[in-house]
A protein has these predicted regions:
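One-carbon transfer enzymes
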Residues: 1-138
Length: 138
């Protein structure tokens, strides 16, 4: 019989947290998954209060902590099995991506850095790619 192991997840979000909350609600049905923390770069983002209200650790940081290794150090201490970027609006530094290779999912479908920002999802990304004669769009 296979032993069940709990997978710890860290969620990154920057705004209202609608996607982050849906992820939380989904994993409430699965005791093999634990959302260990929410990381947010905006101290006024509504997602912070939502996660505090349900008892999940919230970590608020400034952009310079993302760039200078402070967030990486926190993530290494949390040691998540998976990092989910759920409406997180900053570009992840290469150091974090390399430290958590194949353990980061970005559910916001932007093609960064070329096609990021407000409104850049769905057909808007594809239009941008086509208009700029680029070769890749998914």
């Amino acid at each position: 019989m296979l032993k069940k192991t709990t997978k710890n997840i860290v969620v990154f979000a920057s705004g209202s947290g609608s996607n982050a909350i849906k992820i939380y609600e989904y994993f409430q049905k699965d005791n093999r998954v634990n959302i260990k923390a929410l990381c947010c770069n905006k101290k006024s983002a509504p997602v912070i209060q939502k996660f505090q209200n349900i008892g999940i650790k919230t970590i608020v940081f400034e952009k310079n902590n993302l760039d200078n290794g402070g967030v990486l150090k926190t993530l290494l201490n949390l040691n998540p099995s998976l990092i989910i970027l759920a409406g997180f609006l900053l570009k992840m530094p290469a150091e974090i991506i390399n430290s958590f290779k194949n353990r980061i999912i970005n559910i916001h479908p932007a093609l960064l850095p070329s096609y990021g920002g407000k409104g850049m999802y769905g057909i808007n990304i594809h239009r941008g790619v086509v208009e700029n004669n680029e070769l890749f769009s998914c």
